UniProtKB/Swiss-Prot annotation:
<comment type="function">
    <text>Binds to the C-terminal PTS1-type tripeptide peroxisomal targeting signal (SKL-type) and plays an essential role in peroxisomal protein import.</text>
</comment>
<keyword id="KW-0472">Membrane</keyword>
<keyword id="KW-0813">Transport</keyword>
<dbReference type="InterPro" id="IPR011990">
    <property type="entry name" value="TPR-like_helical_dom_sf"/>
</dbReference>
<feature type="repeat" description="TPR 4">
    <location>
        <begin position="410"/>
        <end position="447"/>
    </location>
</feature>
<feature type="compositionally biased region" description="Polar residues">
    <location>
        <begin position="9"/>
        <end position="22"/>
    </location>
</feature>
<keyword id="KW-0576">Peroxisome</keyword>
<feature type="repeat" description="TPR 5">
    <location>
        <begin position="448"/>
        <end position="481"/>
    </location>
</feature>
<feature type="compositionally biased region" description="Basic and acidic residues">
    <location>
        <begin position="23"/>
        <end position="35"/>
    </location>
</feature>
<feature type="repeat" description="TPR 7">
    <location>
        <begin position="516"/>
        <end position="549"/>
    </location>
</feature>
<feature type="repeat" description="TPR 3">
    <location>
        <begin position="372"/>
        <end position="409"/>
    </location>
</feature>
<feature type="compositionally biased region" description="Low complexity">
    <location>
        <begin position="220"/>
        <end position="233"/>
    </location>
</feature>
<keyword id="KW-0882">Thioester bond</keyword>
<dbReference type="GO" id="GO:0005052">
    <property type="term" value="F:peroxisome matrix targeting signal-1 binding"/>
</dbReference>
<feature type="repeat" description="TPR 1">
    <location>
        <begin position="304"/>
        <end position="337"/>
    </location>
</feature>
<feature type="cross-link" description="Glycyl lysine isopeptide (Lys-Gly) (interchain with G-Cter in ubiquitin)">
    <location>
        <position position="22"/>
    </location>
</feature>
<keyword id="KW-0802">TPR repeat</keyword>
């Protein structure tokens, strides 16, 4: 499979801009919000179709090409007066030939040949620099001789006139101006000092400077030596040196703090499998999430077993916000409760609160690295937030935990993979999951989780048809899994099959009516087909399920901004700006019940 989407390899030798494109094709997926589809602006930007030149343009081009040296746009008359005024204080400056006179080649050659270059660069001869400056060639002449050729040639780059003309203009000036300046340099070297005289003069100047430096260095060395002797004498007289205890004790303490205290961590990192090191590399190379923010008002803090209450709420279809509070109480009572952290993360993800879900799932994996459910849920959350490399590395860790023989065999063939971009990492992890899927090809013992992992990988690479096949294969094994139906619906929606996606979301809500994310996705699909009122009803229904009895929405630590922002879009699509003003954190959803059913 090929995962390269760019076409920068075509004609790279003829188009320098394609080389620039290759430098900008680095993986920055950790800095993006979502997986974006192909940009519609590329088609317009690469157009090279140009219309036929009009008669007005032809006349303008003819006038421009017929312009002689007399119509130059470079006028140095004002600069000549400025230089004359500046040099009047130090001496008389020779008159600069006018621009029209400069165009006379014979007179200019006689003036140029009659000049003499100053043999030295002493400060008293600084007034001669003005004369030397005046003897330089006129850039205006070079532009007049050059003509409009390079600019016209550069305007033909399809859709990119500025980049197309910049490089030819620069190269044209260099090529045409270089022959004009080379004779000046050759004539100037005739009156320069010969090699022997130049070396003698340089030695004299270097000797004068060296003597000053030598005196300064000797003075500094003397002062340093005196200061060192004084410090040594004071130390010897006031406090004898204790060689046995002076330095070694401090060195040993620093060694204990910096090395021995971190020995376990260092050994764990050194002895850990290669896939484990890759996991830490890719997951840590993203924006760090803060610690999980707990709700202040939690009615389950006084309950003796809040974890049990949370599990019951999830299994019986209770409100996800209440189940999240129960799991929060459980982890606050026991911060090392890995299963509670994992269920809290899964609950928040289903409640359309991705950030707290990632924080909780990462905490679970830190406590229990082999928690397969948390690893799979975390990879999905990473994908939703656009952290694709972290998602792929998490899937590899999941596979290494459940199918170590597949990963170990691949690692033995290529122990250390080095730095990989998004496409290389995706290709390698996808190949590993395909090998794992081939372990049960008959379909009877198919691993639904392997199919889910493959579906997430294909989804991240925008291969939606393959992802749909994988999720359908997983649903064939677990037809009552609401999560699978929701993931199938999201994949169908991204492949522009909104009607089929709506059916999948309905199935997910039929299995779990409190599934807030499925309601949110259903509202988005309704927006895509222009059913704004139905979309508003689903979004308002999802927001109503965030309501917790006895707790105000505006004081919740974890809120879903996606729901509020999408609801505003719906009201704008309905041209109901009066309703847009009512949407915000802490709003009372009951105020919309007069117009919407939810």
């Amino acid at each position: 499979m090929s995962f390269m989407r760019g076409g920068s390899e075509c004609s790279t030798g003829r188009n320098p801009l394609s080389q620039f494109t290759k430098h900008t094709a680095e993986d920055r997926s950790l800095q993006h919000d979502r997986v974006a589809g192909p940009s519609g602006g590329r088609v317009g930007g690469m157009r090279s179709n140009t219309g036929e030149m009009s008669q007005q343009d032809r006349e303008m081009m003819a006038r421009f090409g017929a312009a002689g040296p007399e119509q130059s746009s470079f006028n140095y008359e004002q600069m000549r007066h400025e230089l004359h005024n500046m040099g009047a204080q130090g001496g008389q400056i020779p008159q600069v030939p006018s621009q029209q006179g400069a165009a006379n080649g014979g007179q200019w050659a006689r003036d140029f040949g009659g000049q003499q270059t100053a043999p030295g660069a002493a400060p008293q001869d600084a007034k001669n620099w003005n004369a030397e400056f005046q003897r330089g060639g006129s850039p205006a002449e070079a532009m007049q001789q050059q003509g409009p050729g390079p600019m016209q040639g550069g305007m033909g780059m399809g859709g990119m006139p500025m980049y197309g003309m910049a490089r030819p203009m620069y190269s044209g000036m260099s090529a045409n101006m270089a022959p004009q300046f080379q004779p000046q340099q050759a004539n100037a070297r005739v009156v320069e000092l010969d090699e022997q005289n130049w070396e003698e003069q340089f030695k004299q100047m270097d000797s004068a400077v060296g003597k000053g430096k030598e005196v300064e260095e000797q003075t500094a060395e003397t002062a340093t030596a005196t200061e060192t002797v004084t410090e040594t004498e004071t130390t010897t007289e006031d406090k004898p040196m204790d060689i046995k205890n002076m330095d070694f004790e401090n060195i040993w303490k620093n060694l204990q703090v910096n090395v021995l205290d971190n020995m376990d961590e260092w050994l764990e990192e050194t002895n850990s499998p290669a896939w484990e090191r890759d996991f830490h590399e890719y997951t840590h190379n993203r924006p760090e999430f803060a610690d999980y923010q707990f709700e202040e008002n939690n009615q389950f803090m006084e309950h003796p077993d809040p974890f049990k209450i949370g599990v019951e709420l999830m299994e019986t279809g209770g409100r996800l916000s209440e189940a999240a509070l129960a799991f929060e109480a459980a982890v606050q009572k026991n911060t090392e409760h890995a299963e509670a952290w994992g269920r809290l993360g899964a609950c928040q993800a289903q409640n359309e609160k991705e950030d707290p879900a990632i924080r909780a799932l990462e905490r679970c994996i830190k406590l229990e690295p082999g928690n397969l459910s948390a690893l799979m849920n975390l990879s999905v959350s990473y994908t939703n937030e656009g952290y694709e490399n972290a998602a792929y590395a998490t899937l590899e860790r999941w596979l290494a935990t459940k199918y170590p023989e597949v990963v170990d065999q691949a690692r033995n063939q290529e122990p250390r993979l080095g730095n990989e971009d998004k496409f290389q990492l995706h290709s390698r992890v996808t190949e590993l999951f395909i090998r794992a899927a081939q372990l049960s090809p008959d379909g009877a013992n198919i691993d639904a989780d392997v199919q889910v992992g493959l579906g997430v990988l294909f989804y991240g690479n925008e291969e939606y048809d393959k992802a749909i096949d994988c999720f359908n294969a997983a649903i064939a094994v677990r037809p009552d899994d609401a999560l699978l139906w929701n993931r199938l619906g999201a994949t169908l929606a991204n492949s522009h099959r909104s009607e089929e996606a709506i059916d999948a979301y309905y199935k997910a809500l039929e299995l779990r009516p409190s599934f807030v994310r499925a309601r949110y996705n259903l509202g988005v699909s309704c927006i895509n087909i222009g059913c704004y009122k139905e979309a508003a009803q689903y979004l308002l229904g999802a927001l109503s399920m965030h309501k917790v009895e006895g707790v105000q929405d505006d004081v919740l630590a974890n809120q879903s901004t996606n729901l509020y922002d999408t609801l505003k879009r719906v009201f704008l699509g309905m041209d109901r700006r009066d309703l847009v003003a009512k949407v915000g954190n802490g709003m009372d959803v009951n105020q919309f019940r007069n117009e919407f059913e939810f």
